[in-house]
């Protein structure tokens, strides 16, 4: 595969994530876009894939609008950052920030290994987010693991 092919595939992966999260299709995200040991970090905590269905259930629904990823390729691994604008479907309030990702090439193609969220605040600060629902799961991910 060429570098250009890798960049196109990783861009498609990021776009698929945004569309599937907008549609609420977390099963597709887990089974087709993440590595089996993948994690998601938000609120200063690391969530494993087994936590994701409950985490998504506790989260607001809405539009995940992502820009093109900035990618750094290194053989069968890569890192990247993806701008995100989230629009809550109930009140159209927006949240903005970016994902910081690690990617791994698998037999099935490129997959997300880790994804962490950074939120931009009106004050100019950046943070990992405010927990939005006390029903969110207790995280079972391990910091630093892909």
Where are the regions a protein language model picked out?
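Short beta-strand edge/turn micro-motifs at domain boundaries
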Residues: 79, 96-130
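Short, low-complexity N-terminal intrinsically disordered segments enriched in polar/charged residues
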Residues: 1-28, 32
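A solvent-exposed, acidic/Ser-Thr-rich amphipathic alpha-helical stretch
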Residues: 23-86
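Outer-membrane beta-barrel domain signature
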Residues: 39-40, 45, 89, 122-124, ...
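Acidic/histidine-enriched, glycine/proline-rich intrinsically disordered or flexible terminal extensions
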Residues: 123-146
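Short, cysteine-centered beta-strand-loop-beta hairpins and adjacent loop/turn segments enriched
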Residues: 59, 87-94, 122
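Short solvent-exposed loop/turn micro-motifs enriched in small/polar/acidic residues
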Residues: 12, 62-64, 94-96
